[in-house]
Amino acid sequence: MGKPTGFLEYERETGCVISLEERIQNFNEFHIPLSSEMQQKQGARCMDCGVPFCQSGMMIGGMVSGCPLNNLVPEWNDLIYNGNWEQAWRRLMKTNSFPEFTSRVCPALCEAACTCNLNGAPVSVKENEHGIIEYGYEHGLMKADPPKVRTGKRIAVVGSGPSGLAAADQLNKRGHQVTVFERSDRVGGLLMYGIPNMKLDKAVIERRINIMKEEGIEFITGADIGNNYKASRLLKEYDSVILACGASNPRDINVPGREAKGIYFAVDFLKKTTKSLLDSDFEDGNFISAKGKNVLVIGGGDTGNDCVGTSIRLGAQNVIQLEMMPKAPDQRAESNPWPEWPKICKTDYGQEEAIALYGHDPRIYETTVKSFIANDNGEVCAAELVKLSWQKDPESGRMVMHEIEGSNEIIPVDLVLIAAGFLGSQSYVTDAFGVEVDGRTNVKTEPGHYHTSEEKVYVAGDMHRGQSLVVWAIREGREAAKCVDINLMGYTNLD
């Protein structure tokens, strides 16, 4: 705790953003980080708490409080304040494989658990994490450091999202020879094609992948294991296989008119947009156009918000976002005390842009689609909506959804994007390896373990725990790497 009075002297700062009017004209990142001087002041606000909940990653009230990676937040905040950026970088890299990703896309569980929340605003931990990792790149700390000794063991990682990359990075550091198989044309999985460029610039991903390649990790793209590439080949040629394919099976909505043209899953919409942007800056036309259209986004989560922001940048005439649940309160309820994750209403970047552009919040709460209406060409032209109410079931005690009679409304719609979550991984992958899955189609393991029902096969990330955050995927990848290392070598020295 370099400055005991820091939290009293300095206010929370979170950097700036490019104006709404300017940023919606392109797909560039729009967050402007704090200066190093401002980051040092944020480091001074850290109180080096006796119990630092920011790094705890513990379950409270059924949700995680603090960083799942157990990042050493008080340590590197103090190091930043004292100007020791290199040591701060070393302490950050000890626990987090990819701070350049989490400092851009993580919802900052650490900040929600910060003790400063009790009497004010939290330390800007996410800003400081971003500052540390970018310092590492700017000052030559982030460079290839291949292992000096190889173990002779070969490991295949199926999937190059955050969990697969984290597992590959750790196992390569241990000296194993790692090959990562990716079904798409670019490495990165969810990071590359599931998150829009304005949230995570793809050059940031490629910058890190290039270092991993220099360190000896092999990447094979266009390899769809279980489809155009046999699982049996991997089991024969590698000592261990880690499945890290994500939860890529989107949840559909089965209502009348679903077969109409112009209705897409959000993941397809976002992927096509990013691919066309990277391939040709949209010159190839291989994306789903929203220009001049009334867009309906079904789903109120992060993916739904990304669809709102992407639709705006593609020239949508209007955007409506449906949320089945009631609007969350603006402040914590008494039943949701600190350090629990705050269950409050958040207006994200896409919604902010819609409010500024269209003059209204795009979100409509407690509402769902009853049916879609198509024109004579089979194209969606309208959607029938219905209001919902939530009532507690007297027998189960659970909240049950009911449609409100007479609340039906028809709105014009030209493009529908379904962002209703995911149901697990693609079954052809699990079938190809013969691994057991649970009732939610996640790959089954013993609690707290990563070894599947097949001897050589392990699992990590959303494919293991279900749809979750990038920070959780990184943790899963690191933990799975330890499991593999122990089984191959008899022990592990991985963090």
Task: Annotate each predicted stretch with a short phrase.
Residues 159-162, 299-301, 462:
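Glycine-rich Rossmann-fold phosphate-binding loop(s) that bind the pyrophosphate
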Residues 304-307, 314, 463-494:
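A conserved FAD-binding loop/helix module that cradles the flavin
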Residues 12-34, 42-45, 365, 373, ...:
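C-terminal catalytic lobe of FAD-dependent flavoproteins
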Residues 40-44, 48-56, 62-147, 213, ...:
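Glycine/serine-rich phosphate-binding loop and adjoining beta1-alpha1 elements at the start
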Residues 155-157, 178, 295, 457:
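Conserved hydrophobic helix-helix packing surfaces used for dimerization/oligomerization
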Residues 87, 149, 154-158, 206-255, ...:
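Feature captures the FAD/FMN-dependent oxidoreductase FAD-binding
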